[in-house]
Amino acid sequence: MDTNETDRNAQAILSDGVYKDDDLLAAGKKIDLHMHSTFSDGVFTPDELVKMRKDEGYDVVAVTDHDGAKGVKEALAAGEKYGVKVVPGIEIGTVMNVSDIIPEACDKSMNKGEVELHILGYNIDPDNKALCDQMQKIKDFRDERNRKLLWYFQEKGFDIKYDDLIRTPGQEYVAKPDFAWVFVNRGYVQNVSEAFRSEKFLAAKAVQRLKQMPYPTGDAIKLIQGAGGAAVLAHPMKIKGIGEKGSDEFFDNLIRLITRLKEMGLAGLEISHPSATPEDSERLVDISHRTGLKITMGSDYHGPQNKKRA
C-alpha cells in the first residue's frame, strides 16, 4: 500500500464516523466506537447493540469484536434498519517490544520489554482475505490455549467442562473472562474481578503464562490498512509496563510509544474509555494534538455489568 492510500484510509476515519475535537464537543453528537457483541465476549448481538444505542440517541456506533469481524455485516444491516451510522470495526490483541524506546519496561513487564496493546480497526472490509485468514489463525491459537487452561483447572480439582464456557448460543470466542464467569456461577468467587485477582484462579502464574497468540502490533496495523481501514490505539490507560497509571512517567512513555506506533501507521487514539478519568482524557487529547493523531471515543461495552462512558 502506498503512502497516499494509507493517508486516504486514515482520513476515512473522519468521513465515516470519527470526529475532530471540535466536532466531539458539538451539541447532539453522541458516538460509541467501541462495543463487543456475542461474536466475541459481549452479551448482546450486533443488532441488539445498534438498536440499544439508537434508542439512547447515539449518532454513530461501531461493533469492534475481539480478533474477528464476523459481526460487522449484522451491525451494518442493523444500522440501515434503525437509522444510525455504523462504522465497520474490529479490535485486535497484539504485543510490541518497547525495550529500545522504554528501557525500563524490561523491568516492569512480565515479558522483558513486551507490552500488550489492543488495536482498533475502523472502516475495514470484513471479507478481506488476509484479515479473515489471520483472525482464524488467532482463533485456532486461542482455542488451543483454552484447552490448556481447561486442563489446568481440571487438574486442580475444579469440575469444569468446555461447554460450561459457552455463555451465548453460537459463541465462537472463548477467553479468560468466560472462565471467570464459570467460577462466579459456581460460587468459587464473588465476582469476575476476584477471579482475575486470585492466585487460585486466573492470577496463578501458570495461568498467566498461557497467553493468547503474540501477534506483533506492527503487523496488525498493516493488516488493518490492507483491509481498507485505519488503526487506532485502544484504551491507552490500560497499558501495563510503562509506568504507574496516570503518572508523569506513564504519559511520557506513552508519548514515546505512540510516536513509534504512528511511524508504523497508527492513525488515531482512543481518548475516552471507562479506564480513563476526565483528567486522563484531557491529557490524551493533548497527546493526540502533539502527535497528530485523530481521536475516538468508546464505552468498551460488553453488557449491563459495564460502566458506560462515551
PLM-predicted stretches and their roles:
Residues 25-175, 264, 270-308:
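A metal-dependent hydrolase metal-coordination microenvironment
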Residues 5-22, 26-40, 44-45, 56, ...:
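Domain-core and long-helix interface of multi-subunit machines
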